[in-house]
Amino acid sequence: MSDIQSPAVAVSPAVTDEYAPILPDVPAVELIAQIEHLRREQRAVILAHNYQIPEIQDLADFTGDSLGLAVEASETDADMIVFCGVHFMAESAKILSPGKRVFLPHLGAGCALADAITPESLDDWKERYPGYTVVTYVNSSAEVKAESHICCTSANAVSVVRSLDTDKVLFTPDRNLGRWVAEQVPEKEIAIYDGVCPTHDVLRQASVNLTRTEYPEAVVIAHPECRQDVVEAAHEVCSTTGMLKAVEKYPHAKIFIIATESGMIHQLAKRFPDKQFIPADGCIGCRLHCPYMKVTGLQDVYFSLLDERFEITLDEEVLEGARLSLERMMAVPRDN
């Protein structure tokens, strides 16, 4: 069972290009060569989320979902981590590798879902639900993680909740993922915070059904950050890395409708060139497109390596508290 209530939601600042350097006359191939040189010189590793632009995904040493990137950050022997994702991901890399220097190439790479919860709003919810164990999705700030018992990703959220000794859970901040978890773990009483990922929340089942009329034989794969009606229309519900595994379950299927941020199509097409991947459209007829994930370009990575911008720093007390919640998460196996 679950209980969803609404907090006051902070609005993420607009993506800004204030810090984006301009190199209009440098061909991409030359820029990539310079990045490769600087990467070796700095003993750096470049990590990229599956939602990044194709050029960044192809350049990265490792591309994956939040959990996979967290594991990679914790295990790397590189001196410098350049994290091509959004701010909370770079923070998590710093938390898990406090001795490494971690850089976010573009300061505009925020997250509206992470902005939907603050330590103060979490405290309010703790007062409303005393005795509940706080499970926080990694799409959150380091300060919120530090005030949580354990974190989770979309790849292990169900296993994390099942692993807890308590029957009462406060799940934050994504209500759609929280609902999905509550359905999979009905034996626990789950109170659900009311944040959303705007990119996923815009999608409606009617839009998915319209796409299915064009491709009736298609397999639908949805991210659990999608609304409940979209999840119910899907054949598979999983994280982005889980989507790669899900495709392998349908060896005879040729067409897949993918209900997540459009950047995932690139990874799927690379892995399965003989299959067709159709991006699910939002209710306003547009691709599911996260502006924060798409703000990082090749020149941002170049200047991050060249000028060592922009380094992630965290208060030691916050870092230690957040580390405990992340390490507890990483001790739990993946769901998908």
Please place each PLM-identified region on the residue numbering.
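Active-site loop-to-helix "anion-binding N-cap" substructures in soluble metabolic enzymes
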Residues: S2-I258, M264-I265, A269-N336
